[in-house]
Amino acid sequence: MKSVKSVFFVILVILMVQGVSMSAQQSPKVRAPEITGGRGWLNTDKPLSIAALKGKVVLLDFWTYGCINCIHIIPDLKKLEAKYANQLVVIGIHSAKFQNEKDTENIRRIILRYEIEHPVYNDSEYAVWQSYGVRAWPTQVLIDPAGYIIGGVSGEGNYDVIDQVITKVVDEFRKKGELNEEPLKLVLERAKVGDLPLAFPGKILANAATDRLFIADSNHNRIVVTKLDGTLVETIGTGEAGAADGAFDKATFHRPQGLALSGDTLYIADTENHLIRRADLKSRTVETIAGTGEQTHDYFKAGPARSVALSSPWDLQLVGHVLYIAMAGPHQIWMMDLDKNEVSTFAGSGREARLDGPLKEAGFAQPSGMATDGKTLYVADSESNIIRAIDISEGTVKTLVGGDLFEFGDVDGTGDDVRLQHPLGLITYGDKLLIADTYNHKIKELDPKSKKVTSLFGTGKPGQSDGTAPSFYEPAGLALANNKLYVADTNNHAIRVVDLKTKAVSTFRINGLTPPAKNMQALETATGPNAEEIKVAPQKLRAGTNGSLEIDVELPAGYHLNPLAPQRYKIAIDSKSVTVDEKDASRAVKDLKLPLRVPLNAVGAGPANVRAQVTLFYCREDNTGTCRIRTLVWQVPIEVTSDANAPTDVKLQGKLTATD
């Protein structure tokens, strides 16, 4: 593959600069290697190949899901997919940096979190990466409809050059009659799963004085406010992705993360809008206070907060009248002077590195979590797998514990001997720090003085077990109140509560919380999601009786109905011979018990057709993996008869599977 390595990174730029035609005679003839050697495909029901995609322009996106730069280009990929819907196939080649990122189920959850709609290949052993000579994340490689490499580029901000080349390639191969413009049909991961009250919650904030818990319900694009006992207070945001200011029920966000509280003011890191928002808890309004809505690629900017662009603000900490911002995009810590309404760079050169020293010379790597005791700003430096300490008054940065960009693992100990894996959350606990060691699925304790780290909770493997031997699934946010630790257990779509006295863990239940209306409406289609029609033989009912429609569904071994999701059913009848009360005809039921029994009245003799539909959300009993959603539909011909021996009940049966 020497020829691939030597040419493909520069061809694309040369072609654009010189305006060279993309014909086979004028561009280097390097056949695109096939996509093999990994653990399989997602977002498609069958394997894809370069050969089978002949006639399509193919864009390979080499990425790893913990990389902020890889996340930044997802909107560009979506724009390209929309613009060239019938000519272009984008394929994500997920070549993992971290061990945790090699797991196909973890990649599936990231696909769901970022609403990725193109096929993704799990290149867990770097087979495709090596065959294409890739050197960095993210890298995009463009392949022409004849199956030859056009070129490749690395990093962010390459939309325009890729767009222009695709336009030329499409025009040329269309003229030659060698362009396949039939849309590629895909089976997306999102079609296989349901929606829960919380979706990938990121950060969390607790306030004992006001009995409030604030949850960044990131993938529902809203903030959920509850009491500490789980009573729902309100939601901030409609659930739609957007950046609208205004009343709580009109405002919109886009995957919010970090939160900070001052009195009746809640500050919100609106991550994918690249904004800082302010929610007034008294007037119940949202206002944008920093950012332009565009992503910056600058490292040292300062000025009026609304005129300076930001880049993926991930966490917030308030010290006095200064709001510190973990700016994951440029690998820096920024600050906002709330009195002057000005933002500026606080720490970090912009170089992705583990480098201690003076504020502006230090190097960070995707800082994503912060905590403070008022004097020191502690930082979870995720991609370097370390915990940093910034002395605010002295203006210095030092590393407390951990490895480096490619030195990670799960090892307790002291100082540089400690190994973490992409930690995202921090909080002070007395004179200690608690760490959400995200990719190790653990909560750990750090003594900043001795630099000793000890694992406290979690098995090191993903799960959702409560009790004194708990398990988590990529926990990302931490909050403390009344000697209880609240954990945003992101991949479990849940908030977990650790009683720091008893050391027992429970799952936090929010009474009355449902997914945003737009999410529920999407599920209420005419036939329901993932519908299966079940044929039923004609049945008889005895006239003049009050019986029931009994629906029993067999779940796959090791699965249970999700108690947090509303199970839904609808009953429709086309005759007056059989009736069902309006209140029983269509319902959403939490904690549904099977078999389901719906009262049914056989009024008088005659034929009737009953249509019964149930939509069930079911998950593994250990709550690992994604939950599934399936709709079963029965069409039942019924004869209501005066026969005294006829039954009074209609019984329907169905079966769910653990496979798609």
What is the predicted function of each stretch?
Residues 23-50, 527-534:
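N-terminal "domain-start" segment that seeds a small globular fold
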Residues 71-113, 124-128:
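Structural microenvironment flanking redox-active thiols in thiol-disulfide oxidoreductases
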Residues 144-203, 513-522:
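Thiol-/selenol-based redox modules, centered on thioredoxin-like
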Residues 182-202, 230-255, 285-312, 342-366, ...:
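Gly/Pro-rich loop segments of beta-rich domains
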Residues 49-68, 90-91, 612:
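Short active-site neighborhood of thiol/selenol oxidoreductases, capturing the structured segment around
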Residues 230, 502-660:
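Extracellular/lumen-exposed scaffold segments
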Residues 62-79, 558-561, 626:
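Conserved redox-active cysteine motifs that mediate thiol-disulfide chemistry
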Residues 112-116, 122-165:
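Thiol/disulfide oxidoreductase modules built on the thioredoxin-like
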